[in-house]
Amino acid sequence: MVEASLRVSGSTNPISGRIVANGAKNSALPIMAACLLLNGSVVLAGMPDLRDVTVMSELITSLGGRISFLRNTKEKANHKVEINCDNLHNWAIPHEITSQMRASCLTLGPILTRMGRAEVALPGGCSIGSRPLDMHIWALQKLGAKVEVCGNYVKCSSSGKLVGCHIDFQSVSVGATENALMAAVMAHGTTTISNAAIEPEVADLAHFLVKAGAQISGIGTRTLQICGVQQLSGPSHTIIRDRMEAGTYALAAISTGGSVHIAGVTSEILGCLAHELEGMGGKVTDVPDGLVVSRHSPQINPVVLHTAPYPGFPSDMQAQFAATACLARGTSQIHEHVFDRRFSYARELAKMGADIHVQGNTASIRGVDKLHGASVQAPDLRASAALLIAGLSAQGVTTISNAQTLYRGYEAMEEKLRACGAEVELVR
């Protein structure tokens, strides 16, 4: 990935305008991985054009799949992709690909099911603490796979079809639920997954698999039941919209006292984010083609957030809320219960004048009157979005290095913000 920086000129201009919500990255990637299971061509609409999507495309191509991308150049969002995996000839994914994206681990189950073996280098992506694959491996072993970790590779094999079983996760894991689900849809017999993740993106994957011919019940609940089928065929499917992207643009508006019309999403899609946005002083209004988020109160209100699996507050949004809380009238607290070491952005916000302190899994943020521009470095995807929000509301110029991480989750973000009045420039 080419290194890039963002130059943000903070100003009194509020972020105001219309943005079309993109398809959800956290739905697109597992659905692309699931295409490895299918016969025939699959047409996916609502696809975001992101770095992680590009890497997943390269991964599928390296296995023998074919991918064509039809871009929506007008909106720079919600593109179409056609994927055909009829002629897979490889089961090993090298470190050069997996090191770029954690979601590469989601191909373990599909490759194993399709090819009888899989060899995937340990994944990369954002460095936000320990996110081991133990639960993924355990679930595949329960289904009858032989799994071993050799150096930096996970090697899986099966002597025949996987066999349905009861998988009872000790803790909720989105990725492990998705891997187990994809491995089970063509296993012999019935599989029950207890304590399954219920994120909308997991449900979207399940609905896609049902369209392809899978037999899955309990979608959207903590218990999934899967009756294995002989084969799956490629359907057409539209990716759900990205609640994390929408929430990020909403916070940019609240931080700057603006108003954004986000087309394609609803307050229902935002879930608990809508409630927290209003708690900070925002107003969330559903309109016929989406929703409008504006700053309702003259000041930003402090928040107390506890991250948790869905339907709780998403860990992927805590950094952006922290950036907005830097200007709140009062003290905010953010408690991170999903990942460890996810407050690496705190020292960067402090360079901009934020009064933020981290102890263990809690960040305390005492609001200040103003932030000032500074040179900062984005440690990961969501932190880069947080620093951008802070830069938009700061006085002076903020330069965000390592900003290429932003494009793992946000498509053409600087262009969309410029259309809403921001002064943002991408420098490569």
UniProtKB/Swiss-Prot annotation:
<feature type="modified residue" description="2-(S-cysteinyl)pyruvic acid O-phosphothioketal">
    <location>
        <position position="126"/>
    </location>
</feature>
<feature type="binding site">
    <location>
        <begin position="25"/>
        <end position="26"/>
    </location>
    <ligand>
        <name>phosphoenolpyruvate</name>
    </ligand>
</feature>
<keyword id="KW-0808">Transferase</keyword>
<keyword id="KW-0133">Cell shape</keyword>
<dbReference type="GO" id="GO:0008360">
    <property type="term" value="P:regulation of cell shape"/>
</dbReference>
<comment type="pathway">
    <text>Cell wall biogenesis; peptidoglycan biosynthesis.</text>
</comment>
<keyword id="KW-0573">Peptidoglycan synthesis</keyword>
<feature type="active site" description="Proton donor">
    <location>
        <position position="126"/>
    </location>
</feature>
<dbReference type="InterPro" id="IPR001986">
    <property type="entry name" value="Enolpyruvate_Tfrase_dom"/>
</dbReference>
<dbReference type="GO" id="GO:0019277">
    <property type="term" value="P:UDP-N-acetylgalactosamine biosynthetic process"/>
</dbReference>
<keyword id="KW-0961">Cell wall biogenesis/degradation</keyword>
<protein>
    <recommendedName>
        <fullName>UDP-N-acetylglucosamine 1-carboxyvinyltransferase</fullName>
        <ecNumber>2.5.1.7</ecNumber>
    </recommendedName>
</protein>
<dbReference type="InterPro" id="IPR036968">
    <property type="entry name" value="Enolpyruvate_Tfrase_sf"/>
</dbReference>
<keyword id="KW-0963">Cytoplasm</keyword>
<dbReference type="InterPro" id="IPR005750">
    <property type="entry name" value="UDP_GlcNAc_COvinyl_MurA"/>
</dbReference>
<dbReference type="GO" id="GO:0051301">
    <property type="term" value="P:cell division"/>
</dbReference>
<dbReference type="GO" id="GO:0071555">
    <property type="term" value="P:cell wall organization"/>
</dbReference>
<dbReference type="GO" id="GO:0005737">
    <property type="term" value="C:cytoplasm"/>
</dbReference>
<comment type="function">
    <text>Cell wall formation. Adds enolpyruvyl to UDP-N-acetylglucosamine.</text>
</comment>
<feature type="binding site">
    <location>
        <position position="338"/>
    </location>
    <ligand>
        <name>UDP-N-acetyl-alpha-D-glucosamine</name>
    </ligand>
</feature>
<dbReference type="InterPro" id="IPR050068">
    <property type="entry name" value="MurA_subfamily"/>
</dbReference>
<keyword id="KW-0131">Cell cycle</keyword>
<comment type="similarity">
    <text>Belongs to the EPSP synthase family. MurA subfamily.</text>
</comment>
<keyword id="KW-0132">Cell division</keyword>
<feature type="binding site">
    <location>
        <position position="316"/>
    </location>
    <ligand>
        <name>UDP-N-acetyl-alpha-D-glucosamine</name>
    </ligand>
</feature>
<dbReference type="Pfam" id="PF00275">
    <property type="entry name" value="EPSP_synthase"/>
</dbReference>
<feature type="binding site">
    <location>
        <position position="102"/>
    </location>
    <ligand>
        <name>UDP-N-acetyl-alpha-D-glucosamine</name>
    </ligand>
</feature>
<keyword id="KW-0670">Pyruvate</keyword>
<dbReference type="InterPro" id="IPR013792">
    <property type="entry name" value="RNA3'P_cycl/enolpyr_Trfase_a/b"/>
</dbReference>
<dbReference type="GO" id="GO:0008760">
    <property type="term" value="F:UDP-N-acetylglucosamine 1-carboxyvinyltransferase activity"/>
</dbReference>
<dbReference type="GO" id="GO:0009252">
    <property type="term" value="P:peptidoglycan biosynthetic process"/>
</dbReference>
